[in-house]
Amino acid sequence: MIKNDISAASPGVSEPCPPRRRLPAVTRVTQILDAALHVFSDKGFASARLDDIAAATGLSKGGVYTHFSSKEDIFGALLKRLIQPVPAAPEPLADDEPVTVDLLVSRVVEPMYQSFGDASVLQAVRLLLADGSRAPQAFDQWHQTMFEPHIADVARLLQRGVQQGTLRSSAITREPRLILSPGIHAMLDCVVRGAAAPDAMSAWERLHVAMLRELLTP
């Protein structure tokens, strides 16, 4: 006698759901931060809730707490991910290579404007301006470990150019941060307008280079 397969024949009986696959922690954290970026950008830090981030990730609130202790913790981790490293310096200069304005443009100015084409750079700036004070450690760490060493490298280039006679001593050589000022102005303009228009960026870059030529050419 052949037995009937009741579960297969009965329309009211469904197949058991496969067990939910556990993702690696690093993958889950990435998903949470991706969702948090959209939630914080849409609602702002103050109005965003952990429930919103959990829902956007497809997790329970407890699932989010497995990886982050608070909304502030998520925000700090997000800023650390978004704040881009300063563009890496090219190969060291040869001992006899002159430091000219053209060299500064290729090593400092051009990489800066190229980075503005990355949407995550503008997202990071918007979050920093709106709520950066809520996660000062993230910004301080970036400033100390990435920005300050970059400025120190620029300062050495400027002083070498002055000593070689290929750059003129000016406010920029005395305060190297000023070499970035037009680019920072351009970046803030993009944040206000909501996008980095290529034509506008090209115009800003041309003005930036013209300023350096006027202030640094002997």
Walk through the language-model features, giving the residues of each.
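Short alpha-helical scaffolding segments that buttress acidic/His motifs in well-ordered protein cores
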Residues: M112, V125-L129, I179-G183, L212
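Basic, helix-initiating cap at the start of DNA-binding domains
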Residues: M1-K43, S47-L59, T66-D73, V99
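Amphipathic alpha-helical interface segments
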Residues: A35, V39, P111, P182-D189
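Short alpha-helical functional segments enriched in proximate histidine and acidic residues
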Residues: V39, S115, D153, L157
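Short, basic, alpha-helical segments at the C-terminal edge of helix-turn-helix-like DNA-binding modules
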Residues: K80-V86
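Hydrophobic/aromatic-rich alpha-helical bundle segments in the mid-to-C-terminal region
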Residues: D140, Q144, E148, Q159-M211
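Hydrophobic alpha-helical connector segments
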Residues: A77, E91-Q123, T173-I179, E205
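Amphipathic alpha-helical segments used for helix-helix packing
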Residues: F116-Q144, L188-R193
